[in-house]
Amino acid sequence: MSKKRLYEIAKELGKESKEVVARAKELGLDVKSHSSSVEEAVAAKIAASFKPAAAPKVEAKPAAPKVSAEKKAEKSEPAKPAVAKEEAKPAEPVAPKTEKVAAKPQSRNFKAEREARAKEQAERRKQNKGNNRDQQQNGNRQKNDGRNGGKQGQSNRDNRRFNDQAKKQQGQQKRRNERRQQEDKRSNQVAPRIDFKARAAALKAEQNAEYARSSEERFKQYQAAKEALAQANKRKEPEEIFEEAAKLAEQAQQVQAVVEVVPEKKEPAVDTRRKKQARPDKNRDDYDHEEDGPRKQQKNRSSQNQVRNQKNSNWNNNKKNKKGNNKNNRNQTPKPVTERKFHELPTEFEYTDGMTVAEIAKRIKREPAEIVKKLFMMGVMATQNQSLDGETIELLMVDYGIEAKQKVEVDNADIERFFVEDGYLNEDELVERPPVVTIMGHVDHGKTTLLDTLRNSRVATGEAGGITQHIGAYQIVENGKKITFLDTPGHAAFTSMRARGASVTDITILVVAADDGVMPQTIEAINHSKAANVPIIVAINKIDKPGANPERVIGELAEHGVMSTAWGGDSEFVEISAKFNQNIEELLETVLLVAEIQELKADPTVRAIGTVIEARLDKGKGAVATLLVQQGTLNVQDPIVVGNTFGRVRAMTNDLGRRVKVAGPSTPVSITGLNEAPMAGDHFAVYEDEKSARAAGEERAKRALMKQRQATQRVSLENLFDTLKAGELKSVNVIIKADVQGSVEALSASLQKIDVEGVKVTIVHSAVGAINESDVTLAEASNAFIVGFNVRPTPQARQQAEADDVEIRLHSIIYKVIEEMEEAMKGMLDPEFEEKVIGEAVIRETFKVSKVGTIGGFMVINGKVARDSKVRVIRDGVVIYDGELASLKHYKDDVKEVTNGREGGLMIDCYNDIKMDDVIEAYVMEEIKR
């Protein structure tokens, strides 16, 4: 079976598609829109549901539009009403049905409308007597023009255009005539003209009458009061008369005030302006007529974008409502002027250094100009964007009568505050922690051997030159209690490392060799421990040697303030032999005893804080830092700020190289995850989140850079001479690369302390890690050489150094680096020469030779006169000339020298004024060794 769509059914029924869709849904059909299709049986069912309008389907379609079209013809052709009526007669039988259809514009019969328009055009052509041509004729004419072409076609087109314009003008004139006829018919409906003078006179008379009615009561009251006063005056004395008159006058004023306050009821004012008559029957095409007469014809009437009804257009409405149109704005009330609100001054003002004038004005709700004026009166020239110091802000607030308080801001980037804040640790959560013990002493007194014995390992045998290069942190267990040991180098170059070890330690073990006694680094270690207020345990080592004398060591230490408990002091002394493991247990028990006396406590519940023991740059791991946790607990993935760098703890390893996830107080660990290698001795702190840690780290790095820039020495009158002198010095540029940060610091400090007159050391760059290509490039650019300490260059860096002729010096012992640097610095100095007199001679005779000069015959009286020596001419004890010899002869032979007691002849270069008895002094310049 075939199907039908709903809009087809609606077209057949003369209904709207949405009505058919709604009726189908009421019948229970599953349809979605007018495009849905149904079976023919279902379509018949839907059609049957529209019983009132279903019978005359086919006949109603042409009839309805004919009526509507011919009605339009009646409107457009008012001059021919008879023709329209005659054409409408055949549609009379179906008139009731077509009215229903005509009410639905969606079902218009376009064919009938086209026929009606064609008839209308035919009628117009008859009336114009052949001046207008139909569309078909115009089309034929265009075809003929196309065939003819040339000038004839152009002239035909011009004629056609002229005819079209004439036809258009005739049509417009016809419509204007028709509208004028309609205006004449409606002329009897125009309102009569208003006499404005009569209207104004009537309005004025009405106002005068109203005023008379309102003032009548006041006049009666005043007259009654006047009569009463006259009667009273007949019976009263003059004084009483004046008093009564005053009272009555007062009452009259009060009455008049009441009358003036009571508003008078006025009739609404009559609008006397001429009103425009309503024109409901006026067509939209009446553009060339208004009530006041004809107006200019609009141009470009055929444009679709032009607003045809200018009277109702938005553009004209906006133009009439503009601000400059006095006609529409005469009755508008002016906008009220906003008054500035008065704000009271605050009682307190919390400020920070560096606040600007604009910020202060906003806080106290005053204008910046007012504050600038007050500052000017105080003698301070400022603008609204200028920062003020705290003292100026306080004086300004005193002038306003406001109490000024400086705001205490918490610096998020300040790590040191965690170490000094009282409220950071929870007193209820404090537990006992392991002691941190630092082993200190002179070079080769057995510090690393002792630590090796404690750890039962042989790390000490691998140390180059018998000295420890960097701090090692280890933990051991004694009697169930942990002890953390720090090993510090004893060489003089590592002073900063020993001071750093003393600052983080709880107990110092001072190792002194029984055969050597007290040495310079021993005294330095004592001073560091006393400065840090750390108790000292003296371990007298090497008691197994034949020349050991512990008593001498005790006496020497007593001279430096370290007294034994046996001598009435507070330092414990233990005689040990680290090599043969003698009295090691006694030493550990002494350490635990001193730690118990100190009552060392820590809070493991807070975020971890501590100190960097060492830092290095690993090729595979990146920046590696050895940390000593002093308070709190350090966990993996904690956001951390270390010195001027930051990061997240990626991995942690203990002193045995095993990975751990948690590190408690007094625990040394190595961590990775920092973006840069920190400096040894820097503090670290764990933050709440990575965002705050990053902000703190970046802020600390920025401050460090600013501090470094501010430390640059500026030239002044005081240091001008030193600056000029320093410019004459020669410089040795050095790039230092080491395995750990402590060695880098020690090398830098030691090289800068080398004192060679005329030469200074400039550290171009120093870092931890292997020597790479960028180091070689920097050395070539800065004319420097590279010192590698316990590191090696990469193969690429070695090849580049050979190609660029960059010198790389590799060392593992620090004092060898210092000696080599001194020799290099001395070799850079300009040689110094010393004058040495080698002989004297006396002129016996002079000979003048033309074209040669003056030859002086001489006799050597002391030493010798050499050909390559310099000479001075001395006459009467005064040096006349100082120069070189041009020639030296013995008789006629050229000789290299003339010895004592012999005679010869000489010529002096560029000097001929030689006279008899002149003394010739010969001398040479010899280089002085430094």
Curated annotation (Swiss-Prot):
Quick one: which residues bind GTP?
Answer: 441-448, 487-491, 541-544
**Identification of the protein by name:** Translation initiation factor IF-2
Residues of the region (G5) are: 577-579
Span list, region Disordered: 50-217, 260-346
Q: Which HAMAP family does the annotation name?
A: IF_2_B
Specify whether Translocase is a keyword of the entry: no
Domain spans labelled tr-type G: 432-599
Q: Which cysteines are joined by disulfide bonds?
A: none
- Chain's role: One of the essential components for the initiation of protein synthesis. Protects formylmethionyl-tRNA from spontaneous hydrolysis and promotes its binding to the 30S ribosomal subunits. Also involved in the hydrolysis of GTP during the formation of the 70S ribosomal complex.
User: What gene does the UniProt entry assign to this protein?
Assistant: infB
Where does the record place it? Cytoplasm
User: For the region G1, what residue ranges are annotated?
Assistant: 441-448
Q: Which PANTHER family match?
A: TR-TYPE G DOMAIN-CONTAINING PROTEIN, TRANSLATION INITIATION FACTOR IF-2-RELATED
Q: Read off the Pfam families from this record.
A: EF-G_D2 (PF22042), GTP_EFTU (PF00009), IF-2 (PF11987), IF2_N (PF04760)
Q: Quick one: where's region G4? A: 541-544
Q: Which CDD domains match?
A: IF2_eIF5B, IF2_mtIF2_II, mtIF2_IVc
Task: Kindly report the protein's main subcellular placement as a broad class.
Answer: cytoplasm
